[in-house]
């Protein structure tokens, strides 16, 4: 359980005449090495293997060694173990499951099984960042568990990205823990995510972010657009489990666009902007596509920060379709619809984001703000007293105009727990604080108050 570290209070006025403190340089070489290590060829091989199981429908057979979701999940388990063997046993590989029945899309008792691999952090192992992809697939009839459902893009591409990220990141050490998750039951009702999120809450995980990868390989949209230089990150606004008291505070003090998920999405956007050539990330202020859902949602439902990363241009002729040709149009989620280089680019985005998040210190907690009827704005915060604070260098305050989507102004203030921005009027800007490691990696920015709190299940009061 998180407690608060005692840090001397230093009020630091950031007037233009004040000497600027130097933030440690980010280890950009590490991120570039990770980006270059991602292999489109390995991703293609994994997608072809997953497609080769015929169908991966959640209700499909589990006894066959060559067909169905049972064979597919066993292969994923074995692949994680092969990756672990290559890094000297650095991954903890396990199955995670529960029985589901009486549901519209799972009427009969069915075991929904996830495959999880954990790369433990060296300094703060109880802090987690999660990358997920889905094992299961479907055709037009969501209850058809016998027809071929290759699911090449939806979602073998996302699961292959998870496996490739594990191969690349397992070569390195990180302060926080990284979780690589193959989730099942997505098409039947997000059950794999529900199982994992509930277990994470029960086990007291401090989750900095969930990166749900669902369809990361298509570049040819049904609208005729062909584009391999953009991606989308979907991120919810107000927390699902916000209390009436928290809603009232948000109404008066703001935070509608600064939930932890929104600031996690901004983090992903910044990683792409600074480290991924020819990739523009579109930040979409929605939980998911219009009226639709993905495996980040069960985590959001419990208050955890999570986003969906995916292609920009979808082709609905290739989603949830029986394999067929009608009026000269080929339907079905087949391997020919996947661009492996693009899938590798989005896998790299995930890998770099997880590397930066896991190298950074834990996000600050108890972030508060004051400055009404004053020319100045003061931010205060604390660092949770958990393992891993030894890599903390200091903090960085951020601010932006209320109409701006990303953080545009910042100042590194050192290892203090309070900073005053002189002549920055509180009414005109939004504010936040990030923790910075000794090798220059930053946590996500934390907006003041409950609306921006990254610790929904841990004490946020001294």
Each predicted region: which residue ranges?
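A non-catalytic alpha/beta surface segment that caps or lines the substrate-entry region
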Residues: 34, 42-120
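Beta-strand-rich modules
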Residues: 421-443
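Alpha-helical metal-binding/catalytic segments enriched in His/Glu/Asp
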Residues: 117, 131-132, 136-137, 141-190, ...
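Short beta-strand segments within Ig-like beta-sandwich modules, predominantly Fibronectin type-III
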Residues: 409-416
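Metal-dependent peptidase/peptidase-like ectodomains
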Residues: 183-297, 302, 306
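Active-site-adjacent mobile loop/cap segments within catalytic or ligand-binding domains
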Residues: 51, 216-237, 283-359
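Conserved aromatic anchor
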Residues: 375-390
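Extracellular fibronectin type III
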Residues: 438-462
């Amino acid at each position: 359980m998180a407690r608060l570290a005692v840090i001397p209070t230093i009020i630091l006025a950031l007037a233009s005449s004040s000497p600027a403190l130097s933030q440690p340089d980010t280890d950009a070489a590490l991120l570039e090495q990770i980006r270059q290590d991602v292999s489109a060829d390995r991703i293609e091989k994994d997608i072809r293997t997953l497609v080769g199981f015929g169908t991966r429908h959640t209700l499909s057979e589990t006894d066959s060694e060559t067909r169905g979701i049972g064979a597919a999940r066993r292969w994923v388990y074995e692949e994680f173990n092969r990756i672990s063997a290559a890094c000297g046993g650095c991954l903890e590989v396990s199955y995670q499951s529960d029985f589901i029945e009486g549901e519209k899309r799972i009427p009969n008792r069915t075991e929904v099984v996830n495959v999880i691999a954990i790369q433990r952090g060296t300094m703060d192992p109880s802090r987690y960042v999660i990358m997920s992809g889905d094992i299961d697939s479907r055709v037009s009839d969501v209850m058809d568990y016998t027809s071929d459902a290759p699911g090449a893009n939806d979602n073998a591409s996302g699961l292959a990205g998870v496996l490739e990220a594990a191969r690349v990141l397992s070569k390195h050490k990180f302060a926080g823990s990284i979780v690589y998750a193959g989730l099942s039951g997505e098409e039947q009702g997000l059950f794999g995510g529900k199982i994992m999120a509930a277990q994470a809450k029960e086990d007291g995980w401090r989750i900095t972010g969930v990166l749900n990868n669902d369809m990361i390989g298509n570049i040819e949209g049904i609208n005729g657009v062909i584009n391999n230089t953009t991606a989308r990150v979907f991120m919810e606004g107000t927390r699902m489990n916000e209390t009436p008291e928290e809603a009232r505070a948000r109404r008066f003090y703001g935070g509608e666009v600064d939930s932890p998920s929104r600031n996690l999405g901004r983090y992903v956007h910044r990683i792409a902007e600074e480290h991924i050539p020819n990739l523009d990330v579109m930040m979409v202020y929605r939980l998911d596509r219009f009226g639709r859902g993905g495996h980040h949602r069960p985590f959001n439902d419990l208050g955890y920060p999570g986003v969906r990363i995916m292609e920009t241009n979808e082709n609905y002729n290739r989603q949830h379709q029986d394999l067929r040709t009608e009026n000269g149009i080929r339907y079905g989620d087949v391997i020919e619809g996947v661009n492996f280089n693009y899938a590798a680019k989005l896998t790299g985005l995930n890998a770099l984001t997880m590397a930066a998040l896991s190298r950074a210190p834990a996000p600050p907690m108890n972030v508060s703000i004051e400055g009404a009827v004053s020319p100045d704005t003061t931010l205060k915060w604390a660092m949770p007293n958990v393992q891993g604070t030894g890599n903390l260098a200091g903090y960085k305050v951020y601010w932006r105009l209320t109409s701006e989507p990303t953080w545009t102004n910042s100042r590194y203030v050192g290892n203090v727990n309070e900073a005053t921005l002189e002549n920055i009027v509180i009414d005109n800007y939004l504010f936040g604080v990030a923790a910075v490691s000794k090798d220059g990696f930053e946590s996500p920015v934390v907006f003041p108050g409950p609306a921006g709190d990254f610790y929904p299940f841990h004490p946020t009061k001294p």
